[in-house]
A protein has these predicted regions:
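Acidic, polar ligand-binding/catalytic clefts
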Residues: 119, 123, 127, 131-199, ...
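C-terminal motif of bacterial Sec signal peptides marking the signal peptidase cleavage site
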Residues: 20-25
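Bilobed "Venus flytrap"/periplasmic-binding protein-like clamshell domains
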Residues: 91-100, 110-125, 159, 179-241, ...
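Extended ligand-binding regions for polar small-molecule ligands
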Residues: 71-75, 123-125, 187-191, 204, ...
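Extracytoplasmic small-molecule ligand-binding "clamshell" domains
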Residues: 74-154, 348, 385, 389
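Bacterial lipoprotein signal-peptidase II cleavage site
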Residues: 27-37
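Bacterial N-terminal signal peptides that target proteins for export
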Residues: 3-13
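Short helix-initiation/N-cap motifs at beta->coil->alpha
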Residues: 77, 132-144, 192, 230-245
């Protein structure tokens, strides 16, 4: 039942499309993967009809200002959850070009960690991980799609920033991938994995337009007193193509995006190196949804938490029945829909998170399916569980 669509949201965006200039990135949000490390600012949601809509304040350079967005689809209950349940399909915004995060495979299927979190939400809400319609969105399009209600949730390696969370008028869910911006160059140009940013002085640097990546590298170059020529492109396929052709000396985006591109696009006659060893920015990536819908926020957030709680407890898709029977403790019994469950208080079925783990997997399983194949190691990273020295620390299911 999984479906993929591209730019259908533009019919809903209408006049907003002209103002959806560029929105920040997954360098934190480029299309590297579209690259994480795969972000922009937009206007607050439109006021009720009787209230005149105000022009939003001008956004920072990396965030385009937009007109107030149309209200999201509502039902009698007035929320996104009810709308999705009535529709029977989750509309999920993704990149469609971000290696390991969301990319369209040769068979037309959407793959990656972001795509799998779309499936996880569909499993929680509808009981079917395949009840998803994917919408591929550029960095400039993504936040307008959230504001207009063209997508129910955005899983597009988008960086959580103050301006996006406040001025643009959206809400961010739990971080699903802690990333950081890095650079990539050719070893033949005397770069190594230990190179510093100062070494790109005089270089032609390429990245996505309208992303946090673009802003970060511009600000850092000014702080370091180095001169770069910054060329930007609409999507990261164009960035990588220009790099392969020799038009760019250096490309930059989220580190995870660079790792993904290197894994699948490095020519045999070239050696690409990623640097500096310590990323130049923080790029927390995760779900984005319309603001002021607490019920929907709870659903999306606890879907993410469920994958992490299962990971904490060592419960995989193969163990859910044993966990529901109590073999992994009382918390997992509650989480999977047994005695003391809390899912029905959220407007979901008691077995909502049973469906998530059984159909999609826990966080480690999602990681192994999408990130391990391109060489991203969770061990020792910020994405490890808190018990292993990482930042993944879900609240308890009780």
């Amino acid at each position: 039942m999984t479906r993929i669509r591209t730019n259908r949201w533009q019919r809903a965006a209408g006049a907003l499309a002209a103002l959806a200039l560029v929105a920040g990135a997954c360098g934190g949000d480029d299309d590297t993967a579209d690259a994480p490390a795969d972000a922009p600012a937009e206007a607050p949601a439109e006021e009720p009809a009787e209230e005149p809509a105000e022009e939003p304040a001008e956004e920072p350079a990396e965030e385009p200002a937009e007109e107030p967005a149309e209200e999201v689809e509502v039902t009698q209950d007035g929320g996104i959850l009810a709308a999705v349940q009535a529709r029977g399909v989750l509309n999920c915004g993704v990149s469609g070009a971000a290696v390991a995060f969301s990319y369209t495979d040769a068979d037309g299927s959407m793959n990656g960690i972001d795509a799998d979190y779309c499936r996880a939400v569909a499993a929680a809400v509808l009981g079917d991980a395949d009840a998803v319609e994917f919408t591929s969105l550029t960095a400039a399009e993504r936040f307008t799609a959230v504001q207009t209600g063209a997508v129910d949730v955005l899983m597009r390696n988008s960086t959580w920033t103050q301006s996006r969370d406040t001025e643009v008028g959206m809400d961010f869910g739990p971080t699903t991938y802690y990333d950081g911006q890095q650079l990539m160059a050719r070893a033949s140009d005397d770069f190594t994995g230990q190179s510093s940013v100062e070494e790109i002085d005089g270089a032609i640097v390429c990245t996505n337009a309208g992303t946090t990546t673009e802003t970060n590298i511009s600000e850092l170059a000014a702080e370091l007193g180095i001169s770069i020529t910054l060329n930007t492109f609409e999507d990261y396929d164009q960035v990588t193509d220009a790099f392969i052709a020799g038009t760019c000396d250096v490309i930059t985006t989220d580190g995870s995006g660079l790792v993904g591109r290197k894994a699948v696009q490095e020519p045999e006659d070239q050696s690409w190196v990623i640097f500096p060893a310590t990323p130049i920015s923080k790029e927390p990536l995760g779900p984005v949804y319309a603001q002021n819908d607490s019920q929907w926020a709870d659903v999306v957030n606890w879907t993410v938490y469920a994958t992490l709680i299962a990971d904490e407890n060592g419960v995989t898709s193969a163990d859910v029945d044993d966990a529901l029977a109590g073999e992994f403790g009382a918390e997992m019994v509650r989480l999977l829909g047994g005695e003391g469950e809390k899912q029905t208080f959220m407007g979901l079925s008691a077995d909502a998170f049973y469906n998530v783990i059984s159909q999609v997997g826990n966080y480690q399983e999602i990681w192994d399916a999408n990130l391990t194949p391109v060489g991203l190691d969770r061990t020792g990273s910020a994405n490890a569980l808190w018990t292993d020295g990482g930042l993944m620390y879900p609240p308890p299911a009780r």
